């Protein structure tokens, strides 16, 4: 698990972190997730963290997997969340624009298939 990326390096476990770590792990076939350390760094910054990894060479699809299905697999909950599949929880976020663009904002959110936020 990589992160938090938007935080000072005061904790021993992040002292040697680098924005290029995600690309290095990807290039070597290692499954990884990107995290924020919520509530210290709010979860709303997760797409920004993924975008920073993309800026440093991680492919966009790998960054998306790092904040969705890979995170769910590492947590052992991928049978319910992390991908859009029949039988999984229907937790979906729809964005105005690309989710890794810091100017984008969430247009709609569904949790368990129920709309909980709607700007459309």
Where is each model-derived feature located?
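C-terminal cap of metal-dependent C-N hydrolases
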Residues: 85-120
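His/Asp/Glu-enriched, well-ordered alpha-helical/loop segment
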Residues: 3-95
């Amino acid at each position: 698990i990589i992160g938090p990326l938007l935080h000072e390096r005061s904790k021993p476990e992040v002292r040697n972190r680098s924005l290029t770590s995600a690309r290095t792990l990807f290039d070597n076939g290692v499954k990884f997730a990107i995290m924020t350390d919520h509530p210290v760094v709010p979860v709303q910054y997760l797409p920004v963290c993924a975008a920073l990894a993309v800026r440093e060479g991680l492919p966009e699809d790998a960054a998306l997997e790092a904040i969705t299905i890979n995170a769910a697999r590492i947590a052992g909950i991928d049978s319910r969340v992390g991908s859009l599949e029949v039988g999984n929880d229907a937790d979906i976020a729809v964005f105005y624009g690309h989710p890794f663009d810091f100017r984008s904002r969430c247009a709609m959110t569904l949790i368990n298939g129920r709309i909980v936020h709607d700007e459309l």
